[in-house]
Amino acid sequence: MEKRKILVVDDESRMRKLVRDFLVKKNFRVLEAGDGEEAMDIFYEEKDIALLILDVMMPKMDGWEVCREIRKNSKVPIIMLTA
């Protein structure tokens, strides 16, 4: 059975690692992005992402902007994350 993909987007590498480590232990495949623009690129390259976990405050494109853009074309579940 193929692992479900989750895209974790945060400009803080320590936060991405914390979330990634937890999800990997739960048998998910984790993709990572360090900003909103990178997240958009990955999301549209990888067609079968099951969930996005987005930081609210990021450089280039914040989590709310990413959420709005993705909602134009997809109903994928999105969890907004903030410190």
Language model region names:
Residues 44-47, 69-76:
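Conserved phosphotransfer cores of two-component systems
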Residues 9-10, 33, 52:
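Conserved sequence signature across two-component system core domains
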Residues 35-38, 62-65:
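Acidic catalytic/metal-coordinating carboxylates
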Residues 55, 82:
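Active-site residues of response regulator receiver
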Residues 27-34, 42:
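Short hydrophobic/Thr-rich beta-strand motif most characteristic of the beta2 strand and flanking loop
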Residues 58:
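Receiver (REC) domain active-site loop signature in two-component systems and cognate sites
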